[in-house]
A protein has these predicted regions:
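Positively charged n-region of N-terminal signal peptides that target proteins for export
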Residues: 1-4
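Bacterial N-terminal signal peptides
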Residues: 7-14
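Mature N-terminal, pre-catalytic/accessory segment of carbohydrate-active enzymes
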Residues: 20-206, 994-1004
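Solvent-exposed loop and beta-edge segments used for protein-protein assembly and interaction
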Residues: 35-39, 58, 81-85, 100-104, ...
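Generic detector of solvent-exposed, compositionally biased contiguous segments
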Residues: 62-67, 414-432, 436, 556, ...
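Hydrophobic residues embedded in beta-strands of well-ordered beta-sheets
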Residues: 73-75, 87, 713-714, 909-911, ...
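Aromatic-lined, polymer-binding surfaces characteristic
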Residues: 136-146, 155-522
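Extended polysaccharide-engagement surfaces of secreted carbohydrate-active enzymes
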Residues: 470, 477-939, 943-958, 971-989, ...
Length: 1004
């Protein structure tokens, strides 16, 4: 375990006196040019021990004193204690002085004294500038805040509604009518654990409502024609006074300190923040609010910012109301950094952010995609504090000094950081967006380019909701700190740029994002995500650069964004996103365009998260295979009219009852299967998947594999069985479901059939011979093993899952029936079918003949699948278990589950290997080939966004063939793989083997 040592920055000065130790926060100060005498400098001196107030107050004889100024004595320092007993050092322009009109920096030496005794001296630099940092950040952030509904409670109040609320607040001394949450502190409750008291109801329901009303009034104060900056002065004054009253009344009744709540006469906790973060333990607060604190902080941002210039000016004028409100806001916003008790367990690997003491594998507290949500309030805090050096929080467990004893002495709740001044603190949090995941079931960015957030059951694919915000919301912070002393370093920009360039465009086809990895946004407008959200992120990143920011490939990103904006973006390739068991196979750069993708899941991963009232995405991840040519085959409208029991690629019982509604967004759970994986060499790809659902709604099990050839996809299935009783319906493999807008043609048993849009068809055709289906630009070829029943459904024959969102646009479904009890009926308990893009119905007979002549495929002993294309000279093997398979004249025998692709060209072999059952511990994968390959040690570089040095594949002669030993990434190699070896264990490993002697060419 790596021990983390907290290192003080230059402006954190340890002050020692006897047994007492003080850490001084004096990082940044500025004042405007032309400031007259007595003008307060922005930025105050603070002590870390201020966090212990009000329970432990700073000694009353502490004071600050300027010992020396480089220039004439331009400033003086005053010592001030607030109502909680916290000490501050306040600089002012000295009497008879002015800062002048020239920008410069004044340096001085300051002492912290206890009476007449000097405890420590420290340097201070005061910047005299035309615009203070506070003014600059305020100018930048207020418009941004007004553009985000959450920061004013998403309340766009009419002027009439605002007038009514002003009257309510004025009459109620700051209180809105109809709320019971305005109770004096401490709040007192009786609680018996064995018998929950029904009178103890969540307090946050009303708090959130009050926050949102205040937020709406704050927005009106900024933007209303009557109450806004250009509105009626008297009306505006009335709203301002009402906001002061409403904020004071509300913030003063929300418990923050541990003794603000008494349970059975005892304080609920002993730390700042406990007053709110522990309420859930007693049924007094909803857990989601406890962990999503921005629900209570965000709505007050706009009203607080709108009033802040007046509040700070009021403080300068010794206005008691302004001072009380400011102190109440600082107290209230401590809830934002309060953490629920369970998540404070720093050495518990099961808690939200893992074992925080293991800094090699955990990035600490808040290491998840909710940092995008948190950043909204974070960026407001320096402006609300009106100070640069007051720490971002007084919640004590965020400080290294909180951890006194070995082995956790000097531990940091977030590695490498302890609060030391809000401006520096928030700047630092803007660097915590690109957090890597080190293991399955951990939030973070994966080496394959995907990202996970909700990991309660397994690794998820959150490429739109949560993940995209985690990647890009930092641009607000980059812009906020642009060209300041707190600007963000270039590598943090580069992290985002690399993924905007190298990852996301590959998921876009014809202006549409792939719904299979969109997370909870799967049913949103994913065309808008591409044309607006993504393109805005590119522009925001470019605009957020400081003058000294250095980025690679920015011009390339801008060129790609331009092509996307004109809906002209095309690319070709096959990529495996192996951590999330997802693969994309597409063409379009120089070929007829199409896009195919495959999503699997396993005991390591989950499918599509679903927060819908009517569950739909239950089967997402169960071997789902989609093929797009036009680009809108699975858009928002198609998905809204879908039977979600019949996703393309799925093998399952075709039920017609509602999908389970209970159990949360990931109730579909990970699979119970170990074997699932994807493999790609850049041109070709494959997937292997043992369908073995853990949840009890699904009824089937199967061994499934997928083979992505140049312009065809072959899907094989075997060992299809009933796993559970289910609903008693037949088990099917669904070939496709999409909008029924073109003639649907199918040829089976020597007969041609057609259905036209608007026609409702329910056809079941038995056949023992190859058949084909066609619609639009896509064709399907089905190759029976013995006897199949081809199912065609269109129009009203489709059981739409959610009629509330359906618009009546009909879909079609093509499926293969395996019977109620596969293997026990006169229907195949296996399947083989192809999907072919860019084909007409007239061309399908020719394609069928070409397939029969070109492809050799087998399912050996049900547990090994393989295919050989004579035309493309590629062999692909899927081993669900140890065994051997001969295909295309080459036998491969594997000692473990594996994926193997062997592509032969005139001058070289391309060998690709994947481990579909990664555990991070397996050291080698070994197999034998009857075809002899040139012997040698061939180094490989694992695939991914950022390439790392890999290991090697050893090929040695074995009889007339070869023995191949693949050195896998494993736990011994943790540091080599940046402590992500568990994730790299499933990475596609690709080498090129020259047929002639000479140097080896490595695939990059």
């Amino acid at each position: 375990m790596k021990k983390l040592i907290f290192t003080g920055l230059l402006w954190l000065l340890t002050v020692t006196s006897g047994k007492a130790q003080e850490i001084v926060f004096a990082g940044y100060f500025d004042v405007a040019t032309g400031s007259p005498e007595n003008t307060e400098v922005t930025g105050r001196i603070h002590l870390e021990s201020n966090k212990e107030a009000p329970s432990r107050k700073i000694p009353a004889d502490y004071r600050f004193e300027i010992l020396r100024q480089d220039d004439r004595p331009l400033f003086r320092v005053e010592t001030q204690f607030d109502a909680c007993g916290r000490i501050m050092g306040i600089f002012r322009v000295d009497e008879g002085e002015s800062t002048g009109l020239q920008e410069k920096t004044c340096r001085m030496e300051v002492a912290l004294k206890s009476g007449s005794r000097t405890l420590q001296t420290f340097p201070v630099a005061i910047h005299i500038t035309r615009q203070t940092l506070w003014e600059l950040c305020y100018e930048r952030y207020l418009p941004m805040a007004l553009s985000q509904g959450r920061l004013y409670g998403s309340k766009r109040l009419s002027d009439e509604k605002v007038a009514r609320l002003i009257r309510q607040v004025t009459a109620g001394n700051g209180r809105f009518q109809g709320f019971s949450c305005y109770r004096p502190l401490p709040l007192k409750f009786q609680y018996t654990p064995k018998q929950k008291n029904p009178s103890l109801k969540p307090l946050d329901d009303e708090w959130i409502q009050v926050c949102n009303l205040i937020g709406g009034m704050g927005r009106a104060y900024c933007l209303s024609k009557v109450y806004g900056t250009e509105g009626d002065p008297q009306a505006r004054k009335a709203l301002k006074e009402a906001l002061y009253q409403a904020l004071l009344a509300y913030t003063s009744c929300v418990p923050i300190e541990g003794d603000d709540v008494l349970i059975n006469g005892q304080p609920i906790g002993k730390y700042t923040g406990d007053g709110i973060s522990l309420l859930h333990n007693y049924g007094l607060m909803n857990y989601s609010t406890t962990t999503h604190q921005w629900k209570l902080s965000d709505p007050l941002v706009v009203p607080a910012l709108a009033l802040m210039p007046d509040i700070l000016e009021g403080i300068r004028q010794n206005d008691s109301t302004s001072l009380r409100l400011h102190q109440s806001l600082i107290r209230y916003f401590q809830l934002f950094t309060s953490i629920t008790e369970k998540r404070r367990e720093i050495d518990n690997p099961e808690q939200r952010w893992g074992n925080l003491t293991d800094t090699l594998y955990s990035a600490g507290a808040w290491a998840d995609a909710n940092l995008g949500h948190r950043s909204r309030t974070l960026l407001a805090l320096p402006l609300i504090w009106g100070d640069y050096n007051r720490p971002v929080t007084y919640v004590p467990y965020w400080y290294s000094s909180f951890y006194h004893n070995p082995p956790f002495k000097d531990f940091s709740f977030s590695p490498g950081w302890s609060p030391h001044g809000v401006m520096a603190d928030v700047s630092r949090w803007m660097t915590k967006f690109g957090i890597p995941a080190h293991r399955y079931g951990q939030s973070g960015f994966h080496p394959d380019g995907t990202v996970s957030h909700h990991i309660g059951h397994g690794t998820d694919a959150a490429m739109v909701a949560y993940g995209f915000e985690w990647l890009t919301d930092c641009s607000h912070g980059f812009s906020y700190f642009k060209d300041t002393d707190f600007r963000i370093d270039s590598p943090y920009y580069q992290f985002q740029l690399d993924r905007l360039l190298e990852v996301y465009p590959f998921f876009f086809y014809k202006g549409q994002m792939d719904f299979l990895v969109a997370g909870r946004s799967y049913l949103s407008d994913l065309k808008k995500f591409v044309s607006k959200t993504y393109l805005q992120a590119v522009k925001a990143l470019e605009a957020a650069q400081s003058r000294d920011t250095r980025l690679e490939n920015l011009d390339k990103l801008k060129a790609v964004a331009k092509e996307i904006s004109k809906n002209r973006f095309e690319c070709s390739g096959t990529r495996a996103y192996w951590v999330n068991e997802f693969l994309i196979h597409r063409r379009g750069a120089q070929e007829k365009p199409f896009y195919a993708s495959l999503k699997l899941k396993s005991e390591r991963t989950v499918g599509i998260e679903d927060f819908s009232k009517v569950r739909k995405s239950w089967h997402g991840g169960y071997g789902i295979l989609q093929l797009k040519v036009r680009g809108d085959e699975y858009d928002q409208q198609v998905l809204s009219n879908m039977d979600w029991h019949a996703l393309p690629g799925l093998t399952e019982e075709w039920r017609n009852d509602p999908l389970p509604a209970e159990g949360g967004s990931q109730a579909s759970l990970p699979g119970a299967n170990k074997v699932a994986g994807v493999l790609a060499d850049g041109t070709y790809g494959m997937g292997i998947y043992h369908h073995l659902p853990q949840e009890t709604y699904s009824s089937a099990t199967a061994l499934k594999s997928y083979y992505f050839l140049e312009d065809r996809i072959l899907a094989l299935g075997s060992h299809i069985q009933r796993l559970r009783e289910g609903q008693g319906q037949a088990i099917h493999t669904f070939i496709d479901q999409s909008e029924f807008r073109d003639t649907l043609t199918w040829y089976a048993d020597g007969r041609l059939h057609q259905a036209v849009p608007g026609e409702s068809v329910a056809a079941g055709i038995h056949t023992t011979k190859p058949c084909w289906i066609h619609t639009g630009e896509k064709g399907y070829i089905v190759l029976p093993s013995h006897r199949i029943r081809l199912q065609i459904r269109t129009g009203k024959e489709i059981h739409v899952t959610d009629w509330e969102i359906a618009d009546g646009t009909p879909n079609f479904i093509v499926a293969l029936e395996h019977g109620i009890h596969p293997g026990k009926e006169d229907l195949d308990d296996r399947y083989a079918y192809l999907e072919i893009p860019n084909v007409s119905a007239a061309e399908m007979p020719q394609h069928l003949q070409e397939v029969l002549q070109d492809l050799e495929y087998r399912c050996a002993s049900d547990s090994i699948h393989g295919v050989f294309s004579r035309k493309e000279q590629i062999r692909q093997y899927a081993f669900f278990a140890p065994g051997s398979l001969c295909i295309g004249g080459t036998e491969i025998r594997s000692e473990a589950p594996a994926m193997v692709m062997l592509k032969e060209d005139e001058a070289q072999w391309t060998l690709s290997v994947g481990n579909p059952a990664p555990d991070g511990e397996r050291q080698t994968l070994r197999f034998w080939s009857s075809t002899r390959l040139p012997a040698g040690n061939y180094a490989y570089t694992p695939q991914g966004v950022n390439r790392v040095k890999g290991e090697c594949i050893r090929i040695s002669d074995y009889g007339t063939g070869s023995e191949v030993t693949v050195e896998l990434p494993d736990s011994r190699d943790a540091s080599q793989y940046h402590y992500q070896s568990e994730l790299y264990a499933a990475s596609p490993l690709v080498i090129r083997i020259p047929k002639a002697s000479g140097s080896v060419e490595y695939r990059k």
